[in-house]
């Protein structure tokens, strides 16, 4: 009787286990049918049930020989539910246990799709490339298109064009157009571009065409922008975006034309985010050319206006605050304010680091060296100048000799003594006090703490 009872329990457990595996497979097939029929919500529910059934089987029968297959079903279901962060490692682990070639192809396609969703486009292209010869016609055709698309997105334009050869997918002309432009085959790209423009197609991947082609022939792409902004269906935001990106590309070749393009972008869609970014870009160009306190004042006025403009708010506020600090420090140094050397050095650092204005930073560092040569921070300014532009400090060896006793010069030779820490602590405390004062916050003096010289940006001769 007892033996019979044990046998019955074992048999019942085996049935439950077998039913779990069977149901996971049945639900997988149901999910696939629902997807083919376009019942996406129902399919997603089936995939979720696959995960539940698979988890149950794995938890109750971890040593079963069927577990690898169930893990594969679970991994694929996770991918179909777009839980790609979990699906990718699960698929990579489970694919070797896929029951047949069709399952391997389906799982590999899902792996590629998830890699693309996670932004690993190069790996996605490689995975799609493994299933472009799949037996299932629907999967094969989609894999071939996605393979071309992933190659194009990863910048492998020549490979994308090779992969697209002899394919007839209606989505491919847009991919070819971008790939041809990116490969520098502009005349061939223009054949497809002309067709899309003639049909006033604003859904074509124009941003990608302009970006890829702009790296090869910025003038040809600039001429294309003129045609695109004339499309009847182009929205103000589209026009501003195309003009903005064109202006930024042109700045490297023709700053006058680039600035004119940015002005067009600002006017094309005044209330749009790209227009705000264009106005900010123009202000940043003026900021980069600033050399005096008066120059900064004019740009700060523009930046203050941009604080409330979409597309410019955060950066405009940061730049306005930094430029104001630089201007105030430069003016106070000119007026002979106490500790003007520290203020001038910090202003130069702000111009260099926060404003990305190396020319203005160089002017301020040199002012410190020339106007206050006895400052303990003059040697640090010399090193910063040399770091910015070695050719611009022809007297660098003589200056190093003049400041041979400076802790900063000693640090160049690896001699970090207490004098350097004291100077750096003093500079950091002054920076904190000045920053709090500009915000209206009182700062209580604190005892100096030992500070490693690397806590501020290191300055070393090149």
Q: How would you name each of these model-derived features?
A:
Residues 1-5:
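Bacterial N-terminal signal peptides that target proteins for export
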Residues 9-462:
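Acidic, polar-rich low-complexity tracts and alpha-helical solenoid repeat scaffolds
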């Amino acid at each position: 009787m007892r033996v019979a009872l044990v046998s019955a329990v074992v048999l019942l457990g085996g049935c439950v286990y077998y039913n779990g595996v069977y149901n996971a497979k049945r639900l997988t097939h149901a999910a696939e049918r629902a997807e083919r029929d376009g019942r996406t919500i129902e399919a997603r529910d089936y995939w979720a049930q696959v995960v539940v059934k698979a988890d149950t089987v794995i938890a109750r029968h971890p040593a079963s020989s069927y577990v690898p297959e169930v893990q594969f079903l679970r991994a694929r279901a996770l991918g179909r539910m777009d839980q790609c962060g979990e699906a990718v490692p699960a698929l990579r682990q489970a694919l070797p246990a896929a029951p047949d070639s069709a399952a391997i192809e389906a799982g590999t396609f899902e792996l590629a799709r998830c890699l693309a969703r996670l932004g690993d486009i190069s790996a996605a292209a490689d995975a799609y490339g493994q299933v472009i010869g799949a037996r299932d016609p629907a999967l094969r055709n989609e894999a071939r298109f996605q393979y071309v698309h992933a190659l194009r997105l990863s910048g492998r334009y020549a490979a994308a064009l090779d992969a697209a050869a002899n394919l007839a997918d209606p989505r491919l002309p847009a991919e070819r157009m971008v790939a041809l432009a990116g490969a520098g085959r502009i005349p061939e790209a223009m054949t497809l571009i002309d067709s899309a423009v003639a049909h006033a197609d604003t859904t074509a991947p124009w941003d990608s065409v302009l970006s890829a082609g702009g790296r090869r022939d910025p003038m040809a792409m600039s001429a294309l922008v003129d045609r695109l902004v004339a499309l009847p269906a182009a929205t103000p935001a589209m026009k501003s975006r195309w003009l903005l990106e064109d202006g930024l590309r042109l700045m490297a070749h023709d700053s006058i034309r680039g600035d004119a393009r940015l002005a067009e972008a600002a006017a094309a869609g005044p209330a749009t985010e790209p227009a705000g970014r264009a106005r900010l870009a123009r202000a940043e160009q003026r900021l980069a050319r600033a050399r005096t306190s008066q120059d900064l004042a004019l740009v700060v006025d523009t930046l203050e206006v941009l604080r409330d403009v979409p597309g410019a708010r955060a950066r405009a506020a940061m730049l306005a605050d930094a430029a104001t600090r630089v201007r105030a420090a430069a003016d106070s140094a000119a007026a002979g304010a106490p500790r003007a050397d520290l203020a001038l050095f910090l202003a130069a650092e702000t111009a260099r680091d926060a404003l990305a204005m190396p020319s203005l930073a160089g002017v301020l560092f040199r002012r410190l060296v020339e106007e206050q040569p006895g400052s303990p921070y003059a040697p640090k300014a010399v090193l910063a100048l040399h770091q910015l532009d070695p050719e611009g400090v022809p007297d660098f060896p003589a200056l190093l000799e003049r400041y041979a006793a400076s802790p900063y010069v000693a640090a160049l030779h690896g001699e970090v003594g207490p004098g350097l820490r004291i100077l750096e602590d003093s500079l950091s405390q002054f920076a904190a006090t000045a920053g709090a004062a500009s915000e209206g916050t009182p700062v209580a003096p604190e005892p100096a703490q030992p500070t490693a010289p690397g806590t501020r940006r290191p300055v070393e001769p090149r």
